Amino acid sequence: MTITPQEALQRTIEHREIFHDEMLHLMRLIMRGDMSPVMAAAIITGLRVKKETIGEIAAAATVMREFANHVEVQDNSNFVDIVGTGGDGSHTFNISTASMFIAAAAGAKVAKHGNRGVSSKSGSADVLDALGVNIDLQPDQVAASIAETGMGFMFAPNHHPAMKNIAAVRRELGVRTIFNILGPLTNPAGAPNQLMGVFHPDLVGIQVRVMQRLGAQHVLVVYGKDGMDEVSLGAATLVGELRDGQVHEYEIHPEDFGLQMVSNRTLKVENAEESRTMLLGALDNQPGVAREIVTLNAGTALYAANIAESIADGIQLAREAIASGKARAKVDELVRFTQQFKR
């Protein structure tokens, strides 16, 4: 027996869970454009108020993956996504995008899934565009990019066309909903390993268990206690780690890895051009907070990708990738490769 949107709304008002098959049905209605905007808005707001459960989020992510334009990657080994939910309000330069180049230089394959900035001054798509990367690739071209360069950027609108059916509702509501946390769960290339930053401490335990249900292999979900959706230099970082089917939650500190705890204030940018300058400075091995934070995050990503045995080992590999110039060379390689597909 399928649930009606009205019954689902009543369930959220009563703070009761919507079950897996029911959530699949409701999400398919939304993604097909078969639910009225009023009902869709009411249900996603109701879910937010009652707080979405692990089961509800996992079901919604399953449907988003169903409707996505997939990128077929042949070799899944050392394959990782580095992504944040955004919405942390920190307005820093694109740390996860910089980390992609370093991780690829150290031997990982990275499928980065991102968009233009909504809550930030510069989304991953904005800074890659500023670097000269052609972000508007077809799925087969992204697959070729991953095979050739070890990196592929999937511009969210190209891979999730069904999201247009809820876009106007989300825009008009103007508040966070379940869709803000679904993006990092719906990598179109199906990367089995992930470094995922989240905007709220409660999401650490939730998102890592959603990834567990979705069959991921090695995932680190992180929240910097200074509010960053990255591994932070300015505070301890909460970590939810999924490995070998088991979840462990713990805290890490910059000092654990011989790094100095420093404020992230100097990492703030106003636009994509400033983000580009800071990113290139870090990859050019210019000493400073930007280089240290991308080293820390890339090192964590290399651990998630199973290239490194530990975060500490990953940091060492990241340092070598920057110092050798290999990380900086990856920027030019991605620009060259993607520009051949310019339409």
UniProtKB/Swiss-Prot annotation:
Cofactor: Mg(2+)
GO CC terms in record: cytosol
Binding-site residues, 5-phospho-alpha-D-ribose 1-diphosphate: 84, 87-88, 92, 94-97, 112-120, 124
Binding residues for Mg(2+) 2: 229-230
Record-listed E.C. numbers: 2.4.2.18
One MF annotation (Gene Ontology) recorded for this entry: magnesium ion binding
One Pfam family named in its UniProt record: Glycos_transf_3
HAMAP family named in the record: TrpD
Protein name per its UniProtKB record: Anthranilate phosphoribosyltransferase
Source organism per UniProt: Burkholderia ambifaria (strain MC40-6)
Upper classification of the organism: Bacteria, Pseudomonadati, Pseudomonadota, Betaproteobacteria, Burkholderiales
